[in-house]
Amino acid sequence: VWHGWTPTDLIFPFFLFIVGVAMSFSFAARGNAPQLRKVLVRSLILFGLGVFMAAYPRFDLTHLRIPGVLQRIAVCYLAASLLVLYASRKTLYWTLALFLLGYFLLLGSDLTVEGNLAARVDRFLLGGHLWKATWDPEGLLSTFPAIATTILGYLAGERLRPNENVEKGENGHEKAATLFAAGWALILGGLFWSIWFPINKNLWTSSYVLFTAGAALQFLGFLYWVVDVKKWRGWTYPALVFGRNAIAVFALSGLVAKSLILYKVERRDGSLASLYQLLYENAFASWAGPLRGSLLFALATVLFWWIAMLVLYRRRIFIAL
């Protein structure tokens, strides 16, 4: 299905949204300290890591995919940071509106897989360096509305941070209610806009930006109310273990999976299979069947990496950029 969404389509925009939220707290904590150099270095490392993961293990530059998940995070973080640090609040709002409305007008009525303007721009500028032969979900034009997602996260973080509203008597329940209300407004706005501009993750349509940012606001409001207002924090420990080394676990899990797929082993019948395939077949599918085996394999992979990150967490090893 090209248009529409599934729960998995919330993961990436939620991450970009929380990048924006984190920017608000990070920039405020540093005060007037120089921040541009740190932003540039962090963005370059993220982008470079994304390209390295795309190239690994063959490092064939002929058809190396240039866009990617980490590359988009890097560009969105850099662009949003520059706007936040050097543009006025009014300019920030106008830029947000320009990215959403401009993208809507640019794409026009042709939103087909290969015929949309974003895909045509990617083919023209990036040629064979795309995820698919004719398009890329992390392409060039669709990065602009993705930046808007990050900006919305920053604005949410500004609302969430302790400020003068606390001194005026605003309590945590009211702040959580504000986040919920804003979330509903964005969700409804996204659904309404989707009548003309369908919700589409691969195109990162403007309706998708509003819808997912609204959902992220709802989730953020819920977590804020549960963790910071009600002080129910013990259940967050598993997520905290992953969260303190989020980029590390993303990169390492991807590189290990590629390595297991790369190396082939000869079966008894003489056919070749990757270590990844053999692990799945022998440890899970052989007794649980292909469907349940696939689920169990995925859960076991998550558990393996959680334990690995737990070791780092307990040793206070946090790989930060």
Predicted segments, located by residue:
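Alpha-helical transmembrane segments and their immediate juxtamembrane cytosolic regions
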Residues: 1-321
